[in-house]
A protein has these predicted regions:
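NAD(P)+-binding Rossmann beta1-loop-alpha1 motif at the extreme N-terminus of oxidoreductases
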Residues: 1-45
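Rossmann-like NAD(P)-binding element
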Residues: 44-47, 52-100
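General beta-strand structural signal in soluble alpha/beta enzymes
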Residues: 49, 88, 125-131
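Short, conserved loop/helix-junction motifs that constitute active-site signature segments
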Residues: 78-84, 119-121, 144-145
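Conserved catalytic-site region of short-chain dehydrogenase/reductase
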Residues: 96, 133-137
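Short beta-strand and adjoining strand-loop segment in the mid-core
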Residues: 101-109, 141-157
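Rossmann-fold dehydrogenase core element
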Residues: 106-130
């Protein structure tokens, strides 16, 4: 199985490291190709880099580890490629404000998961995961005892 990780910030790096440590193949794509290349070099032979389009095409699972607004844009651009794929969304409906803080980008009562699910094509398998843990916890708490709890949700059986 191959997992594409789109975005190699804190969440993308953590997910990629854990997958490779578990023996899984990852394909990395990022806005700044040099960041993806550096991570692939660190991770070794189970990691490679390519374009977003090729990463999605070649993968069984696609993790979009990007800001929510970027995720919406990527889904609009690549929706047809996502049919039959497992799409993992760790995003939260926030954006950076002018002061370096974060602000909610959706009205109260509307979730990022429901928005993303509505943007996916028929045949995509949506999983909402990793958004309840900060990147630091995701990086440090996996594969430890006692085990951390990671919530996820999907409509698939």
């Amino acid at each position: 199985m191959t997992t594409a990780i789109i975005g190699v910030g804190n969440i993308g790096k953590s997910v990629a490291r854990h997958l490779v440590n578990g023996g899984e193949r990852v394909v990395l794509a990022a806005r700044d190709e040099s960041n993806a290349t550096a991570l692939a070099n660190e991770l070794g032979e189970l990691a490679s880099t390519t374009s977003v389009e090729k990463a999605i095409t070649d993968a069984d699972v696609v993790v979009f580890a990007v800001w929510f607004d970027t995720l919406k844009d990527l889904l609009a651009q690549h929706a047809d490629l996502l049919r039959g794929k497992v799409v993992v969304d760790p995003s939260n409906p926030v954006a950076q404000d002018a002061n370096g803080g974060v602000v909610r980008t959706l009205p109260d009562g509307q979730s990022s998961g429901s928005v993303v699910a509505g943007l996916l094509p028929s045949g995509a398998h949506f999983v909402k995961a990793f958004g309840t843990l900060g990147a630091e916890s995701l990086a440090s708490e996996a594969n430890r005892t006692p085990r951390a709890v990671l919530f996820y949700a999907t409509d698939d059986d």
